[in-house]
Amino acid sequence: MEIHGKNFLETLKELEKHVDSAHYVSIDCEFSGLLRDFNLNNKNTLQDRYELLRKSSIRYTILQIGITFIYLQNNGKSSCIPVNINVSPLVKDELHLKRDFCSEASSIKFLIQQGFDFNKQLTEGVPYLSRIEERNLIDKVNERSTDDLTSSILDACDEEILVDARNQIKNWLSSELSHSTSKYLNITTSNRFIRKAIQSLVKIEFPTLKSYPKRTFLQVRKAIENSTTQCSATSKSELKEDIASDQLILNNLNLIKQNVGLRHLWDYILKKKKSVVCHNGMADLVYLFSLFEGKVPETILEFSELCLSSFKSIYDTKLLYLKSDDLQHVSDGIPTDLLSLVSKISLPPVPSNSSSQRSNVSLNSLIECPYKSMMSRKRPHEAGKDSYDTALLFVYYVMRTKHSDIQRWQNVLPIHGSFLDLNKYCS
């Protein structure tokens, strides 16, 4: 299933239903770049290895996300529903949001060689706002609707204008006490910002007075003497301004909500605390938190705690095929990259009288998927395809081996030649 900017909202409910009902969710990402340190060795700590990934996720971003929903069925088969999502870094001009987009030349070259369509990713991808970006935008809108904004206008206003307004009000009050002047004071103003500034001055320094904005001036009256008749026109004018202001605020908040975009799906996965499957997925997880949360924990301990609190469990198929005794007949003598492992388990079944350790059940017989034929023709390094292949590896493990050590390798992730056991690290 291909998800893009135009069909994301209409397919979101369907995706959420899959999140609800799937037993596992496999995830894969394509990055705009990845920092590497070829000097990493056994002397480097897990924190050193994590710090490299953290810096990488801050500098670079995710171009594409693949998600496959895995259903385990009672008939010994499974259903895998793959989704491919291009992620657009572009934001609407109305949001006034500055966002950097960095890429690594070698990563871009590699993806082009694999047939990656960058024009499609940028123009048709699903937009998003990180949690921090959304919060900052909402705060800006709220600031405009509070007295804090008026205070900032007051501070920025020409001091002489405020001094003159203050003196006019004081003189009027003195004259009004001797009953020798009008029951109201009109203060001429050149624009609405100055009117707001003087309104704030009246509210702060003269609490017994009320001010009413007119087109070219501000009218000041005693609050206790403002009858309904006297102020009806002014009240209507104020009401219209308030309604217009509230509508503007509401429109801005709605605009922000609409542009949360792809993070709605991420939030739903976190809400349901799903079991996640990945392949060499430490980088995927770090980048996902960076993209959607807007920040990544500084320490590997904090990151481990974040993962355990966000997901029910995490399984890494690279680690499983490296370490599980139940899978050594697959991984023995071949690389543990995704393509090599999937090619191995996709081999035709051996005869039942053969001495080979390879399973005598074909991989195809394990999978029921309307996209199976299409996925078999796709090129690797499309995120949707890679998440689907990751799902195949996991399905093979749980349905065609004893998977006796599944608890042992739960929440353990490979990281730059080492392993991070989230359970032990947080204990």
Swiss-Prot record:
One of its GO terms (biological process) is regulatory ncRNA-mediated heterochromatin formation. One of its GO terms (cellular component) is nucleus. It comes from the Eukaryota. GO terms for molecular function: 3'-5'-RNA exonuclease activity; poly(A)-specific ribonuclease activity; RNA binding. SUPFAM superfamilies: Ribonuclease H-like. Belongs to the CAF1 family. This is Uncharacterized protein C29A10.09c. It comes from Schizosaccharomyces pombe (strain 972 / ATCC 24843) (Fission yeast).
